[in-house]
């Protein structure tokens, strides 16, 4: 089976939005109109419409699938003639609603070619919009802005356009204006064709009328068309010269120039409408075809050879079926019917059912079993897939989020996702016996989906411990456990994952001797303990010469040392960053054993750690606060009061960026403080950076607490 659609007619895009901007409704409308468009030839319009919506409501499409494939033929008249040679294939990728998870956002941005950014017509650019926008800037993702909810009281399109400029630093380029607002919203003015699109019928927005622009809107339309053309002609010297000579570009040239400016991120086309009132969605879909990139418009992907520690990116993969197969697994989801599904973006080459793939990240082979494409309301089993496609693979055993899959003969690693160690933990207990069974399964599935989340059992208390990257991270996982898996649980207060280490070298000579009649126990060890550089971890070596300790007893010595590492002498936290050498010892022909040397090493290490100046370490977070300038002073003062160290300031667009190191212990509840200090306009991201010694007065308090 050959490729059904040429790569130029693919659009892989996501919908980015602040939490209440109407993402679900917009996605539902897109799926409704594209689905109807797909079946328009064979189903009577009225008959399919309502079933489709009911089915969609039942199945919760926008929630259950990480990527949905659907189809759209660009058209301007409601009663157009379907033509397969004109149809585009849309892969709509679900971008996470919560932007605090850098890992979640980065992995979805890695597979997007373009995006629709939704704004609430009343609220405009909100804090979370700014955060997603910045991350999309970093990944150079072209965007179209859709000012949604224009039917809402207080909706103001022009205020939203100004906010894009002020708050993101990006250049907005309106290509459509709303006709009316609030309950008088009728449709849009298309500034490229200079005509109105008006929706009047009661058919869920399936039909509209194109008509000349009414007199009272003519002046404002001319003004904004002029601004649009000025931005567009900057993309091409010839067009600019012609425009300065009084010649406006024709419609086809104008679309080409707007496309060029969008792809180069010179500006962002802005449109308007109301998904809830079914107005403005079809022109938005046409704009996806006209202005968002196909996989062929995206620069070639550079990867490195598996095992290359320098990660030199010199292996090129571009969107072509003729290149070796390469793909990125970007999301693991559990499907009630199929089991574990690995959502995968194919960057280059082809994949057939039964093929062997190499998981280049892990060095393991996987066989392609079931392959499917997720359509809005069903999954379609496929036999092969091509570059630019987004598919789901069932039953992969070794693959997790962020892994590269490739041709075993031409290996490449596309992405490296390093998942930092968790820095915060909470104890979680099921409320009932029924919850207990469900909780185990829920935690297992959540951990499979999110590599930055860990679950462990506390050996002493038997409690289940959830570990993650921050307070919000764990809050949301607990919420998902409740919503998706119906597990009710009691949650403990968050705890910081402290560590212990040593500050100076020490030598310890310890003898273990026990006589109880019959065979006794005897072992003597002389240990040299030294601190290592932060992050170097633990190492052990034997420097025994002349058989002072026989070889067969040395594993017992190391086992004894390791048994002390899990619980340090100060407050029982894991001990890190030290090395131990066994430099001397003694044994007894009859009374010595592996166990005797293990006991001697354990007791010797306990003494040695105290002698070597044990100290407590705490996780230090790298905190980035993005804030309007007027709040900078109070935010810096607050960070300093939290034992923070401000490393620098920068400007980004019209905002100030504060970069600081702050102990995690002082960041609990920070989000609420920041909101009240900045009237909700400042946002922050936080990630673990390093461990650092705890000041003595605070260390004393922690030791008392855990004694």
Swiss-Prot record:
Residues 8-296 form the tr-type G domain. GO terms for cellular component: cytoplasm. Keywords: Cytoplasm, Elongation factor, GTP-binding, Nucleotide-binding, Protein biosynthesis. GO terms for biological process: ribosome disassembly. The keyword Nucleus does not apply. It is found in: Cytoplasm. GTP binds at residues 17-24, 94-98, 148-151. Pfam families: EF-G_D2, EFG_C, EFG_III, EFG_IV, GTP_EFTU. Its main location: cytoplasm. GO terms for molecular function: GTP binding; GTPase activity; translation elongation factor activity. CDD domains: EF-G, EFG_III, EFG_mtEFG1_IV, EFG_mtEFG_C, EFG_mtEFG_II. Catalyzes the GTP-dependent ribosomal translocation step during translation elongation. During this step, the ribosome changes from the pre-translocational (PRE) to the post-translocational (POST) state as the newly formed A-site-bound peptidyl-tRNA and P-site-bound deacylated tRNA move to the P and E sites, respectively. Catalyzes the coordinated movement of the two tRNA molecules, the mRNA and conformational changes in the ribosome. PANTHER family: RIBOSOME-RELEASING FACTOR 2, MITOCHONDRIAL, TRANSLATION ELONGATION FACTOR G-RELATED. Belongs to the TRAFAC class translation factor GTPase superfamily. Classic translation factor GTPase family. EF-G/EF-2 subfamily. This is Elongation factor G. The gene is fusA.
């Amino acid at each position: 089976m050959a490729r059904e659609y040429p790569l130029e007619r693919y659009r892989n895009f996501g919908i980015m939005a602040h939490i209440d901007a109407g993402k679900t409704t917009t996605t539902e409308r897109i799926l409704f109109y594209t689905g109807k468009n797909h079946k328009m030839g064979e189903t009577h319009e009225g008959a399919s419409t309502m079933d489709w919506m009911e089915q969609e409501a039942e199945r919760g499409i926008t929630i259950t699938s990480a990527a949905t494939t659907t189809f759209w033929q660009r058209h301007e008249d409601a009663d157009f003639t379907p033509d397969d040679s004109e149809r585009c294939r849309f892969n709509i990728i679900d971008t996470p609603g919560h932007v605090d998870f850098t890992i979640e956002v980065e992995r979805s941005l890695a597979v997007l070619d373009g995006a629709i950014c939704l704004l609430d017509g009343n609220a405009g650019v909100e804090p979370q919009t700014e955060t997603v926008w910045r991350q999309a800037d970093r990944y150079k993702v072209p965007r179209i802005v859709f000012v949604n909810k224009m039917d809402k009281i207080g909706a103001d399109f022009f205020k939203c356009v100004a906010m894009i400029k002020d708050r993101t630093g990006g250049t907005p380029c309106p290509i459509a204006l709303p006709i009316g607002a609030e309950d008088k919203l009728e449709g849009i003015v298309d500034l490229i064709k200079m005509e109105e699109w008006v929706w009047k019928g009661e058919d869920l927005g399936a039909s509209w009328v194109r008509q000349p622009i009414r007199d009272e809107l003519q002046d404002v339309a001319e003004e904004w068309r002029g601004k649009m053309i000025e931005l567009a002609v900057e993309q091409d010297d010839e067009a600019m010269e012609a425009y300065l000579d009084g010649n406006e570009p024709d419609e086809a040239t104008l679309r080409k120039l707007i496309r060029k400016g969008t792809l180069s991120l010179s500006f962002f086309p802005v449109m308007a409408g109301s998904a809830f009132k079914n107005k403005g969605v079809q022109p938005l879909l046409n704009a996806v075809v006209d202005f968002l990139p196909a996989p062929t418009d995206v620069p070639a992907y550079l990867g490195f050879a598996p095992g290359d520690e320098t990660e030199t990116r010199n292996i090129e993969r571009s969107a072509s079926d003729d290149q070796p197969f390469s793909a990125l697994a970007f999301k693991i989801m559990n499907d009630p019917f199929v089991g574990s599904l690995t959502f995968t973006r194919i960057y280059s080459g082809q994949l057939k059912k039964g093929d062997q793939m190499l998981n280049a990240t892990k060095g393991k082979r996987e066989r392609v079993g079931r392959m499917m494409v997720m359509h809005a309301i069903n999954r379609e089993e496929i036999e092969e897939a091509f570059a630019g496609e987004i598919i789901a693979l069932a039953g992969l055993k070794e693959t997790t989020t962020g892994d590269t899959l490739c041709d075993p003969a031409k290996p490449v690693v596309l992405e490296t996702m390093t998942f930092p160690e968790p820095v915060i933990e909470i104890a979680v207990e099921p409320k009932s016996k029924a919850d207990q069974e469900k909780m185990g399964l829920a935690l297992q599935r959540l951990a499979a989906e999110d590599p930055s989340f860990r679950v462990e059992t506390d050996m002493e208390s038997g409690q289940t411990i959830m570990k993650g990257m921050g307070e919000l991270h764990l809050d949301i996982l607990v919420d998902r456990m409740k919503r998706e898996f119906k597990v009710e649980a009691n949650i403990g207060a968050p705890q910081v994952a402290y560590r212990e280490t040593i500050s100076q070298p020490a030598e310890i000579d310890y003898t273990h001797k026990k006589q109880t009649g019959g065979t006794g126990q005897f072992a003597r060890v002389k240990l040299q303990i030294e601190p290592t550089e932060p992050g170097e971890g633990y190492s052990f070596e034997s420097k025994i010469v002349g058989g002072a300790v026989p070889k067969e007893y040395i594993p017992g010595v190391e086992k004894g040392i390791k048994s002390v590492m899990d619980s340090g002498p100060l407050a029982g936290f894991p001990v890190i960053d030290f090395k131990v050498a066994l430099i001397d010892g003694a044994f007894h022909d009859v009374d010595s054993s592996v166990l005797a040397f293990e006991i001697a090493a354990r007791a010797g290490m306990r003494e040695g750690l105290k002698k070597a100046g044990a100290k407590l370490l705490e996780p230090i977070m790298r905190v980035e606060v993005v804030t309007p300038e007027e709040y900078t002073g109070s935010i810096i003062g607050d960070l300093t009061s939290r034992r923070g160290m401000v490393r620098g300031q920068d400007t980004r667009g019209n905002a100030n960026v504060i970069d600081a190191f702050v102990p995690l212990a002082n960041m609990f509840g920070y989000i609420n403080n920041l909101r009240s200090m900045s009237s909700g306009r400042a946002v922050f991201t936080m990630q673990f950076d390093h461990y650092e010694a705890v000041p003595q007065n605070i260390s004393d308090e922690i030791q008392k607490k855990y004694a």
